Amino acid sequence: AAIQAAPVYFDKAASVEKACGLIAEAGRLGATVAAFGETWLPGYPFFIEAPLSDLWWEAAALYLENAITLPGPETDALCAAARAAGIDVVIGVAELDPATRGSVYASLVFIGRDGSLLGRHRKLKPTHHERSVWADGDAKGLVVHQRDYGRLSGLNCWEHNIMLPGFALICQGTQIHIAAWP
């Protein structure tokens, strides 16, 4: 199921609650996978189009405040929702890495229907103004996840216009690919 719904922008608690409801609905409707867009949690940082304005600084601070850690209470809730619905979930998040003292990544989180964290993919190279908010990812997350229905992978947005990330997933035999865009 492609989740076509907006988050509660820059409110991670409300967005997680909404995501859990959407996951439950997708499960009730018979979906195998619920796929959310790029940084659905807590929302795509559209403020990046207004660089160096007062709005940018205020929004950037709020965005950082609403980024999530992996694992953390937000992923715990999403994992519980996936388990209750009996479906896999792929959701884009703004991931705060405490080890880097403030780096935020545009990450895709893969959650199994058993409620386990299968993995994450950090966007390799943020595009244009995104670089003012997100750090560069790495290739560790270019992984295809074996599921009972096929081999699952995903990339964020403009990564689909770069040949090597997709090629890496193709070489691993991806069959179901989540193309997460804002």
Kindly give the residue locations of the regions a language model identified.
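Cys-nucleophile CN-hydrolase/nitrilase-fold catalytic domain and related Cys-dependent amidase chemistry
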Residues: 12, 24-113
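Conserved protein kinase catalytic core
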Residues: 10, 44, 126-128
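Active-site catalytic loop in hydrolytic enzyme cores
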Residues: 70, 75-76, 80, 96-182
